[in-house]
């Protein structure tokens, strides 16, 4: 087993979710298809609720910002032609959601609606979040060693809490000290990691970021964050240069904390 020694100055471990703590297959084969298959029914059931209308307003604002993109799908204004017909408006929102998801967009508006849909599904017991078997034991060990553990994902903070609160391992939210999403910045921008360090109240070199995405790893590294790239089944392959440049682990159990001995 490869062992990666965690630098002594590290006091915070920052975790990505998809492809790092959780199989990509769970996200791609269960979470995302659930949204596509149920978004119209969800909107019809919750259309009159303020939370749903807030989601729609955010999606409409995003659609306006996207109007210059090829193939962009508009969401009409709340007043005007067809606005009095909820089904017509719902279809416009559904079409926009499908379009964004087909491009694997990570917009805050899309993530917020997805998070609300997943909340309903998790609370109804329709699904449980999957974690790799090495994750929970390792995180418990890190916390016992005095480490802080945070999560940074493109999924909304609410969606993150749903995953950790409704997992196949039970409710493991207590293992996480805090959550960050794209509201603090995108994961491929180095400034986001500086903001996270400021929010936590530490230096960037006190953080070890675990992710499966090399572009995120590069951005974090540029900010002065320590990085390890997690190689899991189903993850995108790495180039030879990336394999040489980054520290690689295939399991959280491969991290060695000098402070835990």
UniProtKB/Swiss-Prot annotation:
Q: What Pfam families does its record include?
A: Hydrolase
Its subcellular locations are: Cytoplasm; Nucleus
**Keyword check for Magnesium:** yes
* Enzyme class at the top of the EC tree: hydrolase
Q: Name one GO cellular component term.
A: cytoplasm
A GO molecular function for this record?
acireductone synthase activity
Q: Which GO terms describe its biological process?
A: L-methionine salvage from methylthioadenosine
Q: Which UniProt keywords apply?
A: Amino-acid biosynthesis, Cytoplasm, Hydrolase, Magnesium, Metal-binding, Methionine biosynthesis, Nucleus
Signal peptide (residue range): none
Q: In what pathway does it function?
A: Amino-acid biosynthesis; L-methionine biosynthesis via salvage pathway; L-methionine from S-methyl-5-thio-alpha-D-ribose 1-phosphate: step 3/6; Amino-acid biosynthesis; L-methionine biosynthesis via salvage pathway; L-methionine from S-methyl-5-thio-alpha-D-ribose 1-phosphate: step 4/6
Q: Which cofactor does it need?
A: Mg(2+)
**Per the annotation, which location comes first and is thus the protein's main one?**
cytoplasm
Question: How is the cofactor bound, in the record's words?
Answer: Binds 1 Mg(2+) ion per subunit.
* Residues annotated for Mg(2+) binding in this entry: 16, 18, 212
Q: Where does substrate bind?
A: 153-154, 187
Reaction(s) catalysed by this chain, per the record, are: 5-methylsulfanyl-2,3-dioxopentyl phosphate + H2O = 1,2-dihydroxy-5-(methylsulfanyl)pent-1-en-3-one + phosphate
Q: CDD domains, per this entry?
A: HAD_EP
Subunit structure, interactors included = Monomer.
- NCBIfam families given in the database record: enolase-ppase, HAD-SF-IA-v1
- What is the role of the protein in this entry? Bifunctional enzyme that catalyzes the enolization of 2,3-diketo-5-methylthiopentyl-1-phosphate (DK-MTP-1-P) into the intermediate 2-hydroxy-3-keto-5-methylthiopentenyl-1-phosphate (HK-MTPenyl-1-P), which is then dephosphorylated to form the acireductone 1,2-dihydroxy-3-keto-5-methylthiopentene (DHK-MTPene).
Its name, as the record gives it, is: Enolase-phosphatase E1
User: What is the native source organism of this protein?
Assistant: Bos taurus
Q: Which gene encodes it?
A: ENOPH1
């Amino acid at each position: 087993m490869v062992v990666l020694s965690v630098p002594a100055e590290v006091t915070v471990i920052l975790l990505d979710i998809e492809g790092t703590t959780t199989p990509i297959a769970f996200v791609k084969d269960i979470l995302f298809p659930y949204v596509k298959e149920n978004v119209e029914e969800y909107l019809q059931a919750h259309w009159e609720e303020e939370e749903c209308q807030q989601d729609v307003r955010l999606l409409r604002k995003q659609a306006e910002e996207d109007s210059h993109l090829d193939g962009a799908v508009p969401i009409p204004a709340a007043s005007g032609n067809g606005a009095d017909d909820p089904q017509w408006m719902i279809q416009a929102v559904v079409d926009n959601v499908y379009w964004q998801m087909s491009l694997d967009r990570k917009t805050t508006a899309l993530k917020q609606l997805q998070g609300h849909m997943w909340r309903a599904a998790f609370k109804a017991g329709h699904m449980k979040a999957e974690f790799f078997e090495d994750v929970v034991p390792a995180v418990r060990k890190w916390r016992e060693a005095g480490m802080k553990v945070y999560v940074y994902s493109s999924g909304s903070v609410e969606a993150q809490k749903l995953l950790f609160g409704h997992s196949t391992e039970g409710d493991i939210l207590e293992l996480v000290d805090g959550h960050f999403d794209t509201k603090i910045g995108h994961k491929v921008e180095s400034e986001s990691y500086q903001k996270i360090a400021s929010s936590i109240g530490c230096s960037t070199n006190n953080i070890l970021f675990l992710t499966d995405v090399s572009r995120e790893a590069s951005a974090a590294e540029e900010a002065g964050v320590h990085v390890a790239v997690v190689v899991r089944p189903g993850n995108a392959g790495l180039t030879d240069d990336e394999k040489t440049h980054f520290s690689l682990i295939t399991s959280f159990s491969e991290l060695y904390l000098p402070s835990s001995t």
